[in-house]
Amino acid sequence: PVPPEPTLEEIRNCPVRSRIDDICVRAGLNPPPIDGRDMILHISDTPSTMFPYLRRAIRRLRPAWIVHTGDLVDDVKLECRPGLLDLYRKKLRILLNLLSDETCGAILITGNHDHLPTLLKMTENSTVQVWSRPGRFYIGSFRFRAGHTYEDVMNDAGEYNLFGHNMEHPTAIDAYGRFFL
């Protein structure tokens, strides 16, 4: 049988692990362990080389939800090279396995380098939600809008607006107190 994941308290109290962990956090290899039960982890434009770090981050942060705002396998540019669909599938499977191994909810929004038919087929028996266009969701009383680009969320903004794609529009709070992240 597979041993259970250590609790946050066990991670913090193990002296050897704590010392190694501290070194890894300082080196930027791991995020600090926190209790993220009420947290959303927003990611976007993830190259497959980032998947191992993403797995560690998810396990250590333990978010309630993961929202990916597109370009799931950003190192495979299907928009430019559609012949790489098999490679995209292979790398996408790694990401989907990573997400399905976790206990948090996940929303994936397609980006310009994603292939919706492949994504839908690969998630048909999964709890992962796939959105082909911008949308809204609520967590408690907090209203979120999520899309692949800033333009996807700016006109019909929620309290918290999640987007990726490029860095032309940095994180900001507008005059109405709405967050753009």
Residue spans of the language-model regions?
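Conserved beta-sheet core of the metallophosphoesterase superfamily
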Residues: 134, 138, 145-181
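Short beta-strand micro-motifs in enzyme catalytic cores
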Residues: 39, 115, 143-145
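A structural micro-motif
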Residues: 38, 64, 104, 128, ...
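Flexible, charged surface loops at secondary-structure boundaries
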Residues: 33-36, 59-61, 100-101, 138-140, ...
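N-terminal active-site segment of His-dependent metallophosphoesterases
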Residues: 1-88
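Core catalytic region of metal-dependent phosphoesterases/phosphodiesterases
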Residues: 48-134
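Short, flexible, glycine/charge-rich loop motifs used to bind or transfer phosphoryl groups or to couple energy/partner
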Residues: 29-31, 56-57, 97, 134-135, ...
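Active-site neighborhood of phospho(di)ester-bond hydrolases with catalytic His/Asp-centered motifs
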Residues: 42-45, 66-71, 106-112, 146-148, ...
